[in-house]
Amino acid sequence: EGIKGVENQRKHYVDICNIVQGDVSAEVIATDYEGMIKEGEELAALNPHIVVKVPCIAEGIKAVKYFSGKGIRTNCTLVFSAGQALLAAKAGATYVSPFVGRLDDICEDGIALVAKIVEMYRYYGYTTQVLAASIRHTAHIMQCIEVGADVATCPLSAIKGLLNHPLTDSGLKKFLEDYKCVNG
């Protein structure tokens, strides 16, 4: 947020890669095949942890196929159907990102889509990982775990929500009260 200019964005990606020990998705902005290839190769060259994030459109699927052939890992994003997820996997995507919250926003079941994709990949033996995106709350995280999503991108508030439980709070309060009674 607040990072302007391509060079500053790319420096920011490298900074993130130096902090986290895992994959970092970096999104292409181009929507044409040639532009996606150019941007994706530049992004992939920044750091081995970079995964090139490509939109799930016809040109994006072609780009995923190209990147897969070059050993460049990809995240096919803006996935809203099992058909899109199938094409991404067939093209060799490393990750596919179904958008849970955005589907829920239009009265479709985002978690059901994640479950359908997980089941389809297992049935057909695809190695593409399901990266649940557009997670809005703690229940989404737990539901994604229950249906077998491999990864989820989550807001910090939802992650913190995993710690919250009223019995933990009341139990801790009781422990501390008991401790004070015994130890003054």
Regions found by a protein language model. Give the residues of each.
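Active-site beta-loop-alpha junctions enriched in small/polar residues
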Residues: 27-31, 55-59, 79-81, 100-101, ...
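Active-site beta->alpha loop and helix N-cap motifs at the rims of alpha/beta catalytic domains
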Residues: 1-66, 70, 100
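C-terminal alpha-helical cap/extension of soluble enzyme domains
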Residues: 121-184
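Glycine-rich phosphate-binding active-site loops on the catalytic face of alpha/beta enzymes
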Residues: 1, 78, 94-106, 147-168
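Hydrophobic faces of well-ordered beta-strands that scaffold small-molecule active sites
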Residues: 22-28, 50-54, 72-77, 96-98, ...
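Catalytic cores of alpha/beta
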Residues: 35-39, 63, 81-91, 136-151
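A contiguous pocket-lining binding segment that forms or flanks enzyme active sites
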Residues: 77-131
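Alpha-helix-loop-beta-strand connector modules within alpha/beta enzyme cores
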Residues: 9-24, 61-74, 110-130, 173-184
